[in-house]
Amino acid sequence: GLPVCGETCFGGTCNTPGCTCSYPICTRN
């Protein structure tokens, strides 16, 4: 939820392990 993973998820998925989509960016926890 807090740190940004340096990835966007406009497609709805995140490729970075441990990261989830908090549209439109990927976050970790």
Curated annotation (Swiss-Prot):
<keyword id="KW-0611">Plant defense</keyword>
<feature type="disulfide bond">
    <location>
        <begin position="9"/>
        <end position="21"/>
    </location>
</feature>
<feature type="disulfide bond">
    <location>
        <begin position="5"/>
        <end position="19"/>
    </location>
</feature>
<comment type="similarity">
    <text>Belongs to the cyclotide family. Moebius subfamily.</text>
</comment>
<comment type="function">
    <text>Probably participates in a plant defense mechanism.</text>
</comment>
<protein>
    <recommendedName>
        <fullName>Cyclotide vibi-B</fullName>
    </recommendedName>
</protein>
<feature type="disulfide bond">
    <location>
        <begin position="14"/>
        <end position="26"/>
    </location>
</feature>
<keyword id="KW-0960">Knottin</keyword>
<feature type="cross-link" description="Cyclopeptide (Gly-Asn)">
    <location>
        <begin position="1"/>
        <end position="29"/>
    </location>
</feature>
<keyword id="KW-1015">Disulfide bond</keyword>
<dbReference type="InterPro" id="IPR005535">
    <property type="entry name" value="Cyclotide"/>
</dbReference>
<dbReference type="InterPro" id="IPR012324">
    <property type="entry name" value="Cyclotide_moebius_CS"/>
</dbReference>
<dbReference type="InterPro" id="IPR036146">
    <property type="entry name" value="Cyclotide_sf"/>
</dbReference>
<dbReference type="GO" id="GO:0006952">
    <property type="term" value="P:defense response"/>
</dbReference>
<dbReference type="Pfam" id="PF03784">
    <property type="entry name" value="Cyclotide"/>
</dbReference>
